[in-house]
UniProtKB/Swiss-Prot annotation:
One Pfam family named in its UniProt record: BRICHOS
Name used for this protein in its record: Leukocyte cell-derived chemotaxin 1
Transmembrane segments: 45-65
One GO cellular component, as annotated: extracellular region
Species for this entry: Homo sapiens
Tissue: Detected in cartilage and cardiac valves (at protein level). Detected in the laminae fibrosa, spongiosa and ventricularis layers of normal cardiac valves (at protein level). Expression is decreased cardiac valves of patients with valvular heart disease (at protein level). Weakly expressed in chondrosarcoma.
Length: 334
């Protein structure tokens, strides 16, 4: 009886006896849980590292933007031109040595970019079919600090700027052919002009001033071109006599203004002399800033003979600061 009770056939084994037939499971229970736990740890480390990198990248980008923006300052003001109030703005970018002036809005907007690094000024009018460039002195714009920003803002913000707009001032007229190679222009001027053709501007004067200049030339030229001996060498002098009505500042042989000594000056230094006032960079006798406007016109009836007959004149304005202010900025006094 005891032998029969110990030996149980496999066919008679019930559901309760299955655990006695299964192999031991303790060997697999210690290996399987380790693999997903390790993956979770690696994933957590990757996520934390990525978050830290993003945080440092955001902080670096913020400080880079803040540092680059510290070299740029914007100010808005109001000017009165012929009894009409117009809004204007000035942007000083000391890092790129640029000044940007905007006047008016909509169809009457005019934008001028003064590139002091290359000695070029770009001008564009809203709705115009041309973009203009003219000679500009080469200089270095001093960095504008926080104290200076407050000084400029207190002088310009919320005030009506006086406008210097003389009838006897220079009038800039576009030449007949656009610029073929614009590689010498900065990216800011090219961005301003876009796809528009670019034309050089040449200086001229109103007819009354031109008559006075011609009278002076007629008195001077005969004494300077007279030669003691007649011959073939006197022909160039006669040629110059035929062109005596052509103002010397309107020569086409040079792209830049020949009366401007700064284009021949190397380096980034700016000399404080009366030409700064003459060229409209700053005002020597002024104690406050003002708005300086220039007329830009299209020729009427062809480009030759001189002097120009012009039409369709529009104004481009900029803010002129006292020369003492610029010198103080260069010396670090303000």
């Amino acid at each position: 009886m005891t032998e029969n009770s110990d030996k149980v056939p496999i066919a008679l084994v019930g559901p309760d006896d299955v655990e006695f037939c299964s192999p031991p499971a303790y060997a697999t229970l210690t290996v399987k849980p380790s693999s997903p736990a390790r993956l979770l740890k690696v994933g957590a480390v990757v996520l934390i590292s990525g978050a830290v990198l993003l945080l440092f990248g955001a902080i670096g980008a913020f400080y880079f933007w803040k540092g680059s923006d510290s070299h740029i300052y914007n100010v808005h003001y109001t000017m009165s031109i012929n009894g009409k109030l117009q809004d204007g703005s000035m942007e000083i970018d000391a890092g790129n040595n640029l000044e940007t002036f905007k006047m008016g809005s909509g169809a009457e907007e005019a934008i001028a970019v003064n590139d002091f690094q290359n000695g070029i000024t770009g001008i564009r009018f809203a709705g115009g079919e041309k973009c203009y460039i003219k000679a500009q002195v080469k200089a270095r714009i001093p960095e504008v600090g926080a104290v200076t920003k407050q000084s400029i803002s207190s002088k310009l913000e919320g005030k009506i700027m006086p406008v210097k707009y003389e009838e006897n001032s220079l009038i800039w007229v576009a030449v007949d052919q656009p610029v073929k190679d614009n590689s010498f222009l900065s990216s800011k001027v090219l961005e301003l002009c876009g796809d528009l053709p670019i034309f050089w501007l040449k200086p001229t004067y109103p007819k009354e001033i031109q008559r006075e200049r011609r009278e002076v030339v007629r008195k001077i030229v005969p004494t300077t071109t007279k030669r003691p001996h007649s011959g073939p060498r006197s022909n160039p002098g006669a040629g110059r006599l035929n062109n005596e009505t052509r103002p010397s500042v309107q020569e086409d042989s040079q792209a830049f203004n020949p009366d401007n000594p700064y284009h021949q000056q190397e380096g980034e230094s700016m000399t404080f002399d009366p030409r700064l006032d003459h060229e409209g960079i700053c005002c020597i006798e002024c104690r406050r800033s003002y708005t300086h406007c220039q007329k830009i016109c299209e020729p009427l009836g062809g480009y030759y003979p001189w002097p120009y007959n012009y039409q369709g004149c529009r104004s481009a304005c900029r803010v002129i600061m006292p020369c003492s202010w610029w010198v103080a900025r260069i010396l670090g006094m303000v």
